[in-house]
């Protein structure tokens, strides 16, 4: 008999720590294809941004480094990953049996030694702090390492384990450190690893202490179906929504389609 996913051990770890690392979750071949697609898409996005030409999503350029948002329509591989079968039991098991897509983005980053940390929690309305503590699980984010991040110092995703349960924010002095504050950890894992984390978990990009390498990641976020919290959810072209399969349409609100689709029958 197959063990249901997530396992009881994984659930316990996620509930107590606010994150879960699934090492080598994507195959090496899959990672290679995603990297090839992302490099092509980033080059296209940078050209459009530099020429001031309109395009779907947001493109942020910082020297040789780039971050792009709204990636589902940039390449079929990115759309395919939004409901990747191996991931789906984790999304439905940890968040909601009928999850919605919330947001997607990609990061291609090269050594940035002058940069400090960027600690934050996710969520609109000041990270949902007005709901009181502990902030509930309203968004589940998944980060995929596409480059080897098994060693620290390459901008690795950093987290403060258990901070999703805290009624307090980290001390201001700790948030402004150029390195990790006590208790925070860098997520070190090989390429293809997936990191799932709670919206209220304090997290940040990590410090660069190496001269070589790159931090290349994909991020996908999911939310409850009764939430309307992300502009990306309705920010694609009509053609994009019309091309979605019936299964993928369920990841989006029914009002996006023509005619609108009923969801709760």
Predicted segments, located by residue:
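Short, conserved beta-strand element in jelly-roll/cupin
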Residues: 129-151, 188-189, 221-224
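A short secondary-structure junction signal
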Residues: 114-121, 128-131, 152-158, 168-172, ...
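Short, structured patches in soluble enzyme cores that scaffold and shape functional sites
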Residues: 105, 121-123, 144-148, 159-161
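Non-heme Fe(II)/2-oxoglutarate
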Residues: 201-202, 206-265
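Double-stranded beta-helix
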Residues: 136, 149-206
